[in-house]
Structures are given as C-alpha cells and as structure tokens.
C-alpha cells in the first residue's frame, strides 16, 4: 500500500481540523460526523473514552469529565494563566512535579493525565480522520500549527503530543504564517508586504504582524489576549440569561453545573445563528427542576452585551502595530482567522483600517490547516 502523504493539522483550543494537499490544492477533511472541524474535547464516561463531537456532546451531562486541555500545554502549575483558568474549569487540576495534571474518574478509578496526553488523543482523532479519507494504511507525517507566541517549552510539548499519538511531526509552523500561505500571500511578487493576521477563536485572541518578501516570512510582532474569544461572548449571554431565568421562575441555576453547561451550549448555538440572522432563539427543555427555558436574543442585544469585548479587540491590534513600528496605513493585507471572525461586528475592523478589504474568503476555521 502506498505511503500516505503528510497532513496539516490545526490543533486548536476549541476546535481542530486536518487537511491534505491533493489535486493541486489543500483539501480539508470531514470527520466521521461529516464536520470539517472537530471539537478539541476528550470525555470519559463510566464505560468509554470519547473524542471530538461525541465528547463535546457530553459536556452538559458529564462536565467534570469532559476535557479541553490546550491552555495547559507546556505550562507550569504555578503559571498565573493556569491559576486563572482553573477557576472556570469544571474538572480538577492537580500538581505533579511542578506540572499541571487533570484528574478524573474513569471506570471506577481515579486517573490523571498531562495536557499533552489529552491533546495527543485529539491528534490521534485527526490522524484517524485523515486515514479514513485517504484509505491509506497509516498517516504518520504531519505539519502542526501553533500560535506565534508559543515558547520553546510549548512547542516541544506540542511535538510530544505527536510522539504520544504515534505521529512524526515534520514541522511546527506559526499559525499566522500558515494563514498567510493559505491566502497565497507568499506568492505575490514585488516589494516587501506587511500583513496583519487577526485570529479570534474560541478561547484566545491573537494579532500578528508579518512581513513577506520573496516568499520569506518574518514575524515582526505578536499581541494577544488569552481570555478573549468566542467562549467569552458565550459567557456574556449565559450571564444575561441566568438572572432572566431566576426572575421568571424564582430558581437559581448557577450552582448546577449541568444546567449551566446546557445553557452555554444553547447560547453558543444562538451566537452562531446571529452571524447570519438578526435574531436567534434559545430553547432548552427541562433546563432546571423540570422547567423549560425559551427566549430569544437579537443581534443588537448580543452586540450590546459584548460591546466592551468587541472594542477590546482593537487594543491588541494597536499594540501589534506599535511593536512592529508600523502605522496602520502601512498594512497591505488583513487576514481574518478563527470562527469568531464571522461575527458581523468583528468584521467592522475594516473601519479601523479606513475600509481596507479583509481577506476572509477561506473558511476562518480552516485557514491554518495547511501543508507546505
């Protein structure tokens, strides 16, 4: 059987995807559910381990054992970001040898996992997705993208994820570089070009300024907000909806993690709808103590709830420009990456750049899963 080609994997905080170079272009591969992106979740039930869509579907009924671990990769337990994130996770994180480990109950036993072990399970899912599509015996070689801000420890930890999953990581590529390649910006000839990558995903927000000259990339600056992303927009809707439920029914759902997870899932679905419609319904049967929750939210209300967060996206943009020692007029290309850039208010970013056209024709969830 012929050797499988190398694949490109975007191992994301909330979603991952895999692509392969075939027929003269990169093809993004759909998973066994028919989805081109796969939730970066692993869940442990009383009887089995689930990865991807099946795992995310368990977050409402199984919040303590549904894990998303990329924020922990390559970090120490004492890291201030780890401490901050632990307050929001329903699962338990403990210290072992100075490193964070996730503790869960599985098949009646207490188990602990490093973040790299959890992420390797997601990588394995991507590997299996590619193998099912290609019909090859084994996909072993991969190029994996990482955020530009990842330090050496985090990059090495990402390679370890590959080793654990049985893959050979050919190269680690910066996500903004991958996005620029996806748009063919490295193929545009002529003088040096300045590119701003606006990467707003589920859990984080990154801005990078690159220069490209004769196919050579240089990252001039990066700026980020580790707690600004789609999940934060979801949380605002949850924070708005919980008191509404309490006013209507005199019941407080906030101590009930399962109810809050179900509400968050419904809010995320409504948020996605509001990118293409001006109104969305939130409908949850038996949310809490047998009480149904039905409401609707308009795009205008959604924008109002998140107005400070949307405004907050400009600060990292300004910081990245300042660190790169560039005026915004000197930016030749703006590339949108990440599912949250579908939000119409976010696309108003072009107003800041005096109406400059945005590169957004490629599915923003898939823009960095490239093979070079």
Curated annotation (Swiss-Prot):
Keyword flag ATP-binding: yes
Pfam hit, one: HSP70
Coiled coil location: none
Keyword Nucleotide-binding: yes
Keywords: ATP-binding, Nucleotide-binding, Stress response
Source superkingdom: Eukaryota
GO molecular function term, any single one: ATP binding
PANTHER family, sorted: HEAT SHOCK PROTEIN 70KDA
Family: Belongs to the heat shock protein 70 family.
Name the UniProt record assigns to this protein: Heat shock 70 kDa protein II
Organism expressing this protein natively: Paracentrotus lividus
Gene that this sequence comes from: HSP70II
């Amino acid at each position: 059987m012929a050797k499988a080609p190398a694949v490109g994997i975007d191992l994301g905080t909330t979603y991952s995807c895999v692509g392969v170079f075939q027929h003269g272009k990169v093809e993004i591969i759909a998973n066994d559910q028919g989805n081109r992106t796969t939730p970066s979740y692993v869940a442990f039930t009383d009887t089995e381990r689930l990865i991807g869509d099946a795992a995310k579907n368990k977050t409402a009924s199984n919040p303590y054992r549904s894990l998303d671990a990329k924020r922990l990769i390559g970090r120490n337990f004492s890291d201030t970001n780890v401490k901050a994130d632990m307050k929001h996770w329903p699962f338990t994180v403990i210290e072992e040898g100075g490193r964070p480990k996730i503790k869960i109950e599985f098949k009646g036993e207490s188990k602990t996992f490093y973040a790299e072990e959890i992420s390797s399970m997601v990588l394995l899912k991507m590997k299996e997705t590619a193998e099912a599509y290609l019909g090859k015996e084994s996909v072993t070689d991969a190029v994996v993208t990482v955020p530009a801000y990842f330090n050496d420890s985090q990059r090495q930890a990402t390679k370890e994820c590959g080793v654990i999953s049985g893959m050979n990581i050919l190269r680690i590529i910066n996500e903004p570089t991958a996005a620029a390649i996806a748009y063919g910006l490295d193929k545009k000839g002529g003088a040096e070009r300045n590119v701003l990558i606006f990467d707003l995903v589920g859990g984080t927000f990154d801005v990078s300024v690159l220069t490209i000259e004769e196919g050579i990339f240089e990252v001039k600056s990066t700026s980020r907000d580790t707690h600004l992303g789609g999940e934060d927009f979801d949380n605002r809707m949850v924070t708005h909806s919980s008191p509404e439920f309490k006013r209507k029914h005199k019941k407080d759902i906030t101590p009930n993690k399962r109810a809050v997870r179900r509400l968050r899932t419904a809010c995320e679905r409504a948020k996605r709808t509001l990118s293409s419609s001006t109104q969305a319904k939130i409908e949850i049967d038996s949310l809490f103590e047998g009480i149904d929750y039905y409401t609707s939210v308009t795009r205008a209300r959604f924008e109002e709830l998140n107005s400070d967060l949307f405004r907050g996206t400009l600060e990292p943009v300004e910081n990245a420009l300042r660190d790169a020692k560039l005026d915004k007029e000197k930016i030749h290309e703006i590339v949108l990456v990440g599912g949250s850039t579908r939000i119409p208010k976010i696309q108003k970013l072009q107003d800041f750049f005096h109406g400059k056209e945005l590169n957004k024709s490629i599915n923003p969830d898939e823009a960095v899963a490239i093979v070079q």
